[in-house]
């Protein structure tokens, strides 16, 4: 019995210590000005429109004309991003005709269609877009500025 009492007496403090949880780090302070800048609602979220770019009806063969079309495509992406209309863009692997993604910082599909129509890959028929509304973190609007700080080269 003494051994049991001794073991319990020794082990209790260790069990108590293990049961203590570490306090979670303090949450960053809410920045109302930043929230307004990125269009955040009270949950830090906002509406977007995803445009999934797929292979279109008239793919352009390799050559100078195609190179110019894609040069215009990248210029259009940069323009829309600098205007704050395009939160994110990038390519897919091309499997099943999925070529790329635009995440527009607009909540209306019709506006996203107008923006997409300004892109040479769409107007040429190289790609077509499929649209979906999306509700996500408004912090996504900070990606373009961050990207510019980590990219050595531009398209």
Specify the residue positions occupied by each region the protein language model found.
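Conserved, structured core segments of small domains
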Residues: 20-155
